[in-house]
Amino acid sequence: GALLPFAPRDQVEKFFEPLFKDYKGGAATFIDGMLQKSHAEVRPFIRSSMLATPDYVGISAMRTMLDDSYATHGNINLPVLATMAQDPFWPKDMRERYTKIAPKMEFQTWDGVSHFLHMEKPKEFNEQVRLFISKNKLL
């Protein structure tokens, strides 16, 4: 689920309601909204990849975002890498709120990318993951 809820539960449920009713129809609009800042050359790939997801998988992923158990039940005491697109929507204290739950978190915000930063800048993303794994001796 989400590390922290991004809105009260009833608002999150309402936000995802179109996806629960008609995943493919709702997902197209949802994805397009997240692609507004996206690099034009990868937009079709991202959109087609996301829409190829089976309905039950997409719906399950959305439902897990309703689970706020991390926010309400203790800490994650393992190394965590958070890579997020810079967005004025995020609360100003998000880094502090996240690291309170996961004290070993490495928190990165990236400019010039959308929600799909791993698909827009795969080499840079993979390098950050590789460095994180190496630094934390996870392999």
Positions of the model-derived regions?
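Alpha/beta-hydrolase-fold catalytic nucleophile elbow
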Residues: 1
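Conserved alpha/beta-hydrolase catalytic His-Asp/Glu region
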Residues: 4-10, 18-75
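Short aromatic-enriched loop/helix-cap "lid" or pocket-rim segments at secondary-structure transitions
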Residues: 5-11, 93-96, 120-121
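N-proximal accessory regions
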Residues: 15, 77-80
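Alpha-helical elements of the RecA-like P-loop NTPase motor core of helicases
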Residues: 59, 92, 127
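Conserved loop-alpha-helix segment in the C-terminal half of the alpha/beta-hydrolase fold
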Residues: 79-114, 119
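Catalytic active-site module of serine/aspartate enzymes centered on a nucleophile-bearing elbow/loop
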Residues: 105-139
